[in-house]
Amino acid sequence: MVLLCLILEGQWQQKWASLKQNMPALALTVMVAWFYLSTIWTEASKTQLEYAANTHWILLLVPAITLLIDDQRWKKRCWQGFGAGMVLLLAHIYALGFTSIPWIRSGSPSSVFFNPLSQSVGLAIFSALCISQIVGNSNRLRQLWLAILFISASYAVLSISQQRLGYLMWATACLLVLMLKLKPVHRKLGVAIALGLCLVVFMSSAKIQERFGLGIKEAQAYHFENNYTSIGSRLHMWYGSIRAISTAPVLGHGLGSYPMVAEAFFKDAAMCDVGCKHPHNQYLFYGVEFGLVGLGLFLWMLYRAMIVHRSLNQDSTMPLVVLLVMALSGLVESTLWYRGWVYLFVPLLGLSMLSPTQGDSKYPHKHDPDS
């Protein structure tokens, strides 16, 4: 509906001028155009091509968001909306400890938001958002409520969840916020204390130690021909993806081609059920389907989005957290392909591509999107 209304509204010259001023959004638009151009040489079946075509267009919501949010008030409201959504998610997570909720399909507190991994990473970002609002806030009551929300979200990530990626992104996001928000005189001490707390959490949690220990064992026990573990399957996908890239390095195998290409290096049907959908690595995924051209456009988009916030001012804190978390999560997950990740990152990516000064001339007194 958002895209349809933007199309029906017209005003193409104004929209094009706005898009050209936002280089990250323009880079993403060019990237998506390249994806669909690759249908000319794709090796995908008709079914796979249709599924891929119905997935990648959602990325166009990112430039749509940058066109629609043109003042500081709406940036602030959108971040508040994300926070409200995470509070609602936390309410469901803790309520499931006492009763069943009919509209939650899994019934598990770790899988309320479609997918356990995206849920834990989303709560990790929310934890960082809470810290960003606590630091420098003079309202003690508000600080107290934010601290309660931070503890609730952190407990959901570190104790209720069993996701290694969630643990790592929680630590990464919280540390980055402290590095960006604290004054230089307090920065080293604050980060040192935070690192110490992370170490205490790790040493005091048998579950976290067990999950990381299991990951190390799975990596050590990996065998190319037959491995069904979480880490082993990923290693197999990545190795096969690199081989697939080498056979079509520049243009790739085309839109929706990964399942067809992956069947060649997944001899076991059970492993193919897991690994023939996507390679659990956003960079290799784009490399296989869209070649070095598509991968280069993706990296260019990330780079342009990050340098928008190179001034490291207050408004850059959460966008940089989102971009770093998405970039790191993309090393082990297909963060712009799988639905659970798309629901999380597409709206946040749109917010993160907005310049810290976008809309200041219209509403200069409303300059606090992190609130």
Where are these regions (language model features)?
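Membrane-interfacial loop-to-transmembrane alpha-helix junctions, especially the N-terminal start
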Residues: W16-V30, W74-F82, Q143-L146, N313-V322
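Hydrophobic transmembrane alpha-helices and their immediate junctions
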Residues: M179, K188, E289-L324
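Transmembrane alpha-helical segments and their membrane-water interfaces
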Residues: L6-Q14, Y36-I93, L328
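Alpha-helical transmembrane segments of multi-pass inner-membrane proteins
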Residues: W74-R105, F114-L182, I193, M203, ...
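A membrane-periplasm/extracellular boundary helix in multi-pass inner-membrane enzymes
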Residues: I160, K181-F224, Y239-T247, L255
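Membrane-embedded alpha-helical segments of multi-pass membrane proteins
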Residues: M1-E9, A52-V62, S118-S127, Y167-L175, ...
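Long extracytoplasmic/lumenal interhelical loops at the membrane interface
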Residues: F224-Y239, R243, T247, L251-F290
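Transmembrane alpha-helices of multi-pass inner-membrane enzymes
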Residues: V2-L6, C174, M301, P319-S329, ...
